[in-house]
């Protein structure tokens, strides 16, 4: 899925290959009705990090002023230094949790959730007030007059884990502060629903959800 370009003709592309026991192999198509929908970490920061860098690049080109990103180090780091969530996989192993489906969030929460629903032939309900949003991300989003929820739903490049688990694993997931339960799986006929903080229901769509609609 990688398309790489270089202004100087030099590219480094790395592929990692691993092994897994057959009974531990988790795909996208195993989500079951009533499973819990969960994510690791927080969402939307990488998109905002990109927004900061693009803004500072424009300022530098126009004025020559060097960017001061010290107070936005976390957000910029979310874009430039994504981390593989090996700690989450280790937590699963330690607590004997086997997700029914899982994938990383590269194109935004909405898009990845719809992938799981399609391949598992299920629907879902997600709750806005359950989405994990970092305070720095929210603060900067508001300063740019952006919706933090929309950044989480459609920003992408967060590389957190989106996964589903059986309800019997609820306590194990809830005990980890780095994991959030954001919804549940439904029958496919019930569709894919996003419920706002105000209780309004909207169809979950790949480009995210717009507060102004």
Name what the model sees in each region.
Residues 22-27, 60-65, 123-126, 172:
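Phosphate-handling active-site elements
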Residues 49-69:
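Short, compositionally biased
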Residues 18-21, 41-47, 54-57, 83, ...:
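Short, well-ordered alpha-helical segments in soluble proteins
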């Amino acid at each position: 899925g990688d398309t790489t370009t270089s202004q100087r003709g030099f590219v480094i592309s790395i592929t990692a290959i691993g092994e897994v026991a057959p009974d531990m192999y988790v795909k996208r198509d195993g989500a079951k009705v009533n499973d819990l929908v969960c994510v690791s970490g927080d969402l939307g920061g990488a998109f905002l990090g990109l927004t900061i860098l693009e803004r500072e690049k424009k300022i530098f080109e126009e004025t020559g002023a060097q960017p001061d990103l010290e107070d936005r180090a976390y957000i910029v780091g979310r874009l430039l230094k994504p981390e593989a969530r090996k700690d989450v996989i280790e937590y699963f192993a330690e607590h004997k949790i086997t997700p029914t489906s899982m994938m990383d969030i590269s194109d935004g929460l909405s898009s990845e959730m719809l992938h799981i629903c399609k391949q598992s032939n299920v629907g879902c309900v997600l709750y806005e007030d359950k989405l994990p949003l970092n305070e720095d991300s929210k603060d900067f989003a508001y300063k740019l007059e952006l919706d933090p929820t929309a950044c989480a739903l459609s920003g992408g490049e967060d590389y957190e884990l989106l996964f589903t688990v059986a309800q019997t694993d609820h306590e194990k997931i809830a005990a980890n502060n780095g994991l959030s339960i954001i919804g549940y799986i439904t029958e496919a006929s019930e569709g894919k629903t996003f419920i706002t903080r105000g209780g309004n229901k909207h169809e979950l769509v790949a480009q995210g959800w717009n507060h102004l609609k």
